Amino acid sequence: MVPHLTTALTGPINELEQRILESMPATERWFRLEWMEHTPPFYTSADLRNAGFKLAPVDTHLFPSTFNNLTPEMLPLAVQAAMAAIEKICPEAKNLLLIPDARTRNSFYLQSVQRLVEVFTQAGLNVRLGSLDESLTTPLPLPLPDGGELLLEPLVRSRGRLGLKDFDPCTVLLNNDLAAGVPRVLEHLHEQYLLPPLHAGWPVRRKNRHFQSYEEVAKKFAKLLGMDPWLINPIHGHCGQVDFADAAGLECVKAQADAVLAKVRRKYKEYGINEKPFVVVKADNATGMGVMALRDVKELDDPERVARGARGLLRGGATPSEVLIQEGVPSCERINDAVAEPVVVMIDRYVVGGFYRVHADRGTDLDLSLPGSTYVPLAFAGGSQLPRPGARPGASAPNRFYMYGVIGRLAMLAAAYELEATDPEAETYD
């Protein structure tokens, strides 16, 4: 089930939302059957875009760092989900080693880590933090905005196990996307559970592969509801050898962008949508970066436009050689007249909350994950009513967060498919 949270949606329920609300029993059963066959990622967050005529994920994060954006009222849901996840993986667990990323000076990130520590502590675990920084030899206090502190400690590796001094955990939880590579200290941990697995990190993971999996999931789900999968699936393309410094190196991007735009134009014509389609170009194996938005491939003939767009894709001083070309989904949602996009947060197979990412200086077709963005937590709606299939729209106080919970879980299920396909230790059968 999905918690009943407030959203920025105030207008009438559209056809897509109504269909999802009315299909709730079939949807929940379908998810139950899928989770019998597939293992959900340990935790996930999904960035969604709601165009009114279409609702789709545009990014799925397997090392979410946004738990600080959940309201305190969401904590019991997160704790219950964490307990369920731990009981499946290591029911006898008493110690959890949490390994954060290097953003130890980012107060918002530290608040997210603090929230994770709180969740797993209340789930019945002793939680301590370990650092991948080999130069750290003594415990390092990390001050928090509320006056508290986190203690980051040096890791201790012994054969097939990883821990801290006088601390031997059953499970090691990564909150680090490994964009800088896989440290040797994390390899060959055969005696412990490492979650998420190493192949969930960016050295292996590709957004293109994820959205291929999502397309498969969306087609299955759309067939269940008797609707066009395009309504919940962003069309995408991929380029594996891109050189932003060379015009010849952009030919693939031009071809893929042209193909995606042509497909979207046909869909817009089919549904009578009077908007100009666009695509976004983003790094295929990284997150937390900008994107390049294109409405016409001729924009790539302008060297200044290309250079400006390439700078937006920078990470670690280098532009990506692999890119995803994704159908742009405009956002119809506003908070205080600023463009907003919902983010759904999940632990195990459960939706534990959500929030809006808001940017007052960005348009409906632009990426909101940039400096200047703010975050608006979603609170519980008044009352605890469930969606009532068949009720007249507006008469049953429907859970308008429900459709976000559905699409978020579809993205999580796609991540499960993706991780199964890339598991280096998966058994194969001829």
Feature map (PLM): residue ranges:
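Conserved hydrophobic helix-helix packing surfaces used for dimerization/oligomerization
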Residues: 95-98, 172, 279
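Conserved N-proximal alpha/beta basic substrate-recognition cap immediately N-terminal to
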Residues: 80-81, 104-121, 126-276
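Conserved metal-phosphate-binding beta-hairpin within the catalytic cores
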Residues: 38-67, 282, 328, 340-349, ...
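C-terminal active-site "lid" helix and adjoining low-complexity regulatory extension at the edge
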Residues: 2-9, 35, 63-97, 359-430
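Short glycine- and acidic-rich boundary segments immediately preceding or forming the N-terminal edge
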Residues: 1-38, 220-230
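Glycine-rich phosphate-binding loop of ATP-grasp-fold ATP-dependent ligases
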Residues: 237-252, 278-305
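Short, flexible loop/turn elements at secondary-structure junctions
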Residues: 47-52, 62-64, 102, 154-156, ...
